[in-house]
Amino acid sequence: MSTEKLASDTSFSLSSAPEPAICPEAERLVRKQETALGYRIMASWGWGADGSGHITARDPERTDAFWSLRYGVPFGEARVEDLVLVDHSGDLIEGSGEINPAGFCIHAPIHSTRPDVVGAIHTHTPYGTPFSAMAAPLPMSSQEAVAFYGMQGVFAGEEVNVTDLATGQRIADALGTGRLVVLANHGLLTVGTSVASAVGFYLNAERAAEVAVKVPDGRVISPAAAAQTHPSVGDELNGWHIFQWLVRSRVGDPTVVN
């Protein structure tokens, strides 16, 4: 869904869904808009105020390259024009400036290993980072956690500052075919078949981590109930819907990124 339509659309409903890509150029713009909006959503909570955090979006044509925010741009000021395109070797393809080096080392192997992943997001949050010190998967103790039932991994390495692609590959391996990887003593990372769903599910992960931190001995949802609920709350479309709500409630006018 383009931000132009989102800005004036009054028909957002349970049946809303992403518009099919018309051409690579249009799809590229949507991915870049969602990326810039994702950064602004993070900023609305104060996440990434110190520059720690990154969102990436695979290019629809240069599938061996991804877009991310130019280093030095405050997340709350992110615009489409502030994104740069780099390939999996780190070469700058389009735009000017650099991207977060840890972001490159973490995200490049994920995009390379997982061709189904369009968007990926990681930052340091009030509950995701404390929970990550457990070096354990999220417990199924909330509805939000069920979105990751059978779809999460744990990277237990002690490289809390990722500075090389080899460590990033180990993170990608820990993620496997899942949607969430807990980076021990570091934070959370989610992926999606769109930038929108990756960001939407990141909020789910943060909320699930909050429950786990605040109520560590709370009741855990049974495997049977989690398996029954997962197809609805864990659907990619649900992640996309969460993103639409976040844009409306946390950003307001989505055209600010254009």
Short names for language-model regions:
Residues 57, 110, 124, 171, ...:
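Divalent metal-coordination and catalytic microenvironments
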Residues 18, 22-25, 29-121, 128-139:
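An anion-binding catalytic pocket shared by soluble metabolic enzymes
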Residues 107, 128, 168-172, 202:
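A general structural signal for well-ordered alpha-helical packing
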Residues 73, 125-128, 135-136, 159-161, ...:
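Short acidic/polar capping segments at secondary-structure boundaries
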Residues 62-64, 80-81, 114-118, 143, ...:
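Short coil/turn connectors at secondary-structure junctions
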Residues 2-38, 179-258:
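A conserved C-terminal secondary-structure "cap"
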Residues 153-189:
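A contiguous binding-surface segment within folded domains or other stable secondary-structure elements
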Residues 126-163, 167:
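Class I SAM-dependent methyltransferase SAM-binding "motif I" and its flanking Rossmann-like core
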